[in-house]
């Protein structure tokens, strides 16, 4: 009689299939998203009990999904690990992409007064768009500014013969020259002085390219002293005429 010992060994990890990749937007006032983690599909030929853990940026879960995870903006790699009763393990990964689709919050000055600063025919002033800001912000980072006039002095010569603005150097006045498209600076000239409030639209952009807008009233003042040129000296005879 011979005794034969046959040992059955399980060296294979469970089969695990991760959920499909997906995208989600950030929460309204935070640069993160609270995601309900989905469950992976797991199966093992030898074990009835398979445990799953989930690792994600900044955290760890001891269950096969079924909990909320707070994820930052960007591509987040999620790792699922399945363990059978023989301590074999298998892994799979998925990607959850968090996008910032929330526009920034624009805050404008109610009213701005601009004084002309240059002499000559135009009295031109270019005002940085950021001057019209009064605390605009975005939950995910810094914002940038551009602005435009809502209308312009149509009869005023904004090219090199007047205000000296000709962005594409063609000698023709266009919307860029008049300041009616969003630019880093907004032009004002002597034709604006005393003309009443000029409406300016401030464009606020966040790092993800989301845009939002607010309006400012601008009054232009002409504080430039007039230029006077006296006639040449003359000599008049006492016998005149």
Go through the PLM ranges and name each one.
Residues 1-241:
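Proline-threonine-serine-rich low-complexity tracts
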């Amino acid at each position: 009689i011979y005794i034969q010992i046959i040992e059955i060994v399980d060296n294979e990890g469970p089969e695990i299939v991760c959920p499909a990749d997906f995208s989600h937007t950030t929460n309204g006032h935070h640069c993160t998203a609270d995601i309900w983690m989905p469950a992976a599909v797991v199966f093992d030929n030898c074990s009835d009990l398979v445990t799953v853990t989930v690792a994600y940026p900044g955290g760890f879960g001891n269950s096969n999904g079924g909990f909320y995870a707070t994820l930052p903006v960007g591509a987040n790699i999620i790792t699922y690990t399945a363990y059978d009763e023989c301590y074999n393990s298998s892994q799979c990964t998925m990607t959850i992409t968090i996008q910032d689709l929330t526009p920034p919050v624009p805050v404008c000055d109610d009213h701005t007064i601009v004084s002309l600063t240059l002499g000559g025919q135009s009295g031109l002033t270019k005002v940085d768009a950021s001057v019209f800001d009064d605390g605009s912000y975005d939950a995910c980072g810094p914002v940038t500014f551009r602005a435009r006039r809502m209308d312009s002095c149509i009869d005023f010569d904004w090219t090199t013969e007047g205000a000296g603005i000709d962005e594409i150097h063609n000698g023709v006045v266009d919307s860029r020259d008049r300041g009616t498209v969003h630019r880093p600076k907004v032009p004002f000239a002597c034709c604006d002085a005393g003309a009443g409030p000029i409406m300016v639209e401030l464009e606020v952009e966040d790092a993800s390219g989301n845009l939002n807008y607010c309006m400012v009233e601008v009054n232009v003042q002409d504080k430039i002293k007039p230029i006077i040129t006296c006639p040449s000296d003359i000599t008049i005879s006492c016998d005149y005429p």
